[in-house]
UniProtKB/Swiss-Prot annotation:
The keyword Cell membrane does not apply. Keywords: Virulence. Induction: Expression regulated by iron through the urbs1 transcription factor. Gene3D superfamilies: 3.50.50.100. PANTHER family: APOPTOSIS-INDUCING FACTOR 1, FE-REGULATED PROTEIN 8. The lineage of its organism: Eukaryota, Fungi, Dikarya, Basidiomycota, Ustilaginomycotina. Protein of unknown function; part of the gene cluster that mediates the biosynthesis of siderophore ferrichrome A which is contributing to organismal virulence. One of its GO terms (molecular function) is flavin adenine dinucleotide binding. The keyword Iron does not apply. This is Fe-regulated protein 8.
């Protein structure tokens, strides 16, 4: 593969990174640690802080730890050392991706008066992930959704609103038996005990269906121990969902109702900017083993947005993909765009840790080990995400 990287000698070259969550953040750190002096990274991210999504289910139930899951981007460019200032983080909404002209349009969230602006790029890392289910999506299902600015304080308020809704409801129906639904159901049941009726429904007979049946067996046993009612093996009949979403039927005729319904259904890839021709039938970006977009070798797609050869959507797979993509970009830059063999991404076996209440968890490792473990602290060790990024935890409100 040969890519023309020729530009005027006085023109700085740019790698645009769309999204700075798990995948984007790792790609940024690998890039800035090794880029030549005439290259910069420009990051477009709508949140002012990294959202530690894996702890969101817990924080939407348990009070007092919300501030820990919004982590400053302060050290994002730290590996660049003395050249840190040449890289840029823009708090912005991405509007349009022009692949032919190699430019992306955006609007600054804190300065909408400046209008739509364009950024030209030489390589682009697409790490916009997926549209999240409402129970963990701070950009939806919120009273202040129209004024949400992606700030930490808005995110904290969103989680507290979620806590209030759960506390007020006497009966709760959770739709979806993946990790999110399971974690919410067990956390609510442990926190509130028999004072709340909790029902978990899932379209398949097996909970956590992408994993070993042992994971389902342990999960189902724990849910029954906690008094959570299970309604498995039938989908929600969407035509029967009431306007307030408090009542609906399953396709097998069973009727469910609650004061609060939490729809924890699957994520959908956030890939509309890439264009329909670049997507598979599930809306995921079609990529080469090098993680280059099949339709454009200058664009690398990583994380939940990529159809990455069977890889599950998870932080550890996003990390691995980010490393492959960033290393390939660096190799192309170092080789002046000339034809070369690039690194290929190979997905690892499915692995996950799922909490089953405040103090219990189960884990399936990449080696296929199935173990019951301590779930860790009540905040799911969220402050570790701070220290791993070289941040002090003395002030968790920064």
């Amino acid at each position: 593969m040969t890519i023309d990287l020729s530009l005027k000698s006085n023109q700085q070259k740019t790698i645009a990174v769309l999204g700075a969550s798990y995948a984007g953040h790792r790609a940024i750190q690998v890039l800035v640690a090794s880029l030549p002096e005439d290259w910069r990274v420009v990051v477009l991210e709508r949140n002012t802080h990294a959202n530690h999504l894996y702890a969101f289910p817990r924080m939407s139930v348990v009070r007092g730890h919300e501030q820990k899951v919004f982590i400053p981007y302060t050290n994002m460019f730290k590996p660049a050392l003395d050249r840190r200032d040449q890289h840029v983080l823009l708090h912005a909404n991405v509007l349009e991706l022009d692949q032919e002209q190699r430019r992306v349009s955006y609007e600054l969230i804190d300065d909408k008066q400046s209008g739509v602006q364009w950024l030209h790029w030489d390589f682009l890392v697409y790490a916009l992930g997926s549209h999240l289910p409402d129970p963990i999506n701070v950009w939806s299902n919120s009273e202040h959704v129209n004024t949400h600015d992606g700030s930490k304080m808005m995110g904290v308020k969103w989680l507290r609103d979620a806590q209030d809704r759960i506390e007020k409801a006497e009966s709760i129906v959770i739709v979806g038996g993946g990790a999110l639904g399971v974690q919410l159901a067990t956390d609510i049941a442990v926190t509130y005990g028999s004072s709340k009726k909790v029902t978990l429904t899932h379209s398949r007979p097996q909970l956590l269906p992408r994993f070993d049946p042992w994971m389902h067996e342990k999960t189902a046993a724990r849910l029954q121990e906690l008094g959570v009612e299970l309604a498995l093996g039938s989908r929600v009949d969407l035509s029967t969902v009431s306007e307030d979403k408090k009542r609906f039927k399953l396709l097998d005729g069973r009727e469910l109702q609650g004061d609060l319904t939490l729809f924890c259904l699957g994520q959908t890839p956030n890939t509309s900017l890439l264009g329909a021709s670049s997507l598979n039938d599930s809306g995921m970006a079609k990529v080469e083993p090098t993680l280059q977009l099949s339709a454009n070798e200058r664009i690398f797609v990583i994380g939940d947005a990529a159809d990455a050869f069977g890889a599950i959507n998870a932080g550890h797979t996003a990390w691995d993909q980010a490393e492959v993509a960033a290393k390939n970009i660096l190799a192309l830059i170092d080789n002046k765009g000339q034809a070369m063999k690039l690194e290929e991404y190979k997905p690892t076996p499915p692995a996950i840790k799922v909490s089953l209440g405040i103090d219990r968890a189960i884990r399936q490792t990449m080696a296929g080990e199935l173990v019951e473990v301590d779930s860790g602290s009540i905040d799911l060790n969220s402050t570790n995400m701070w220290t791993r990024r070289g941040l002090s935890t003395d002030d968790l409100w920064q």
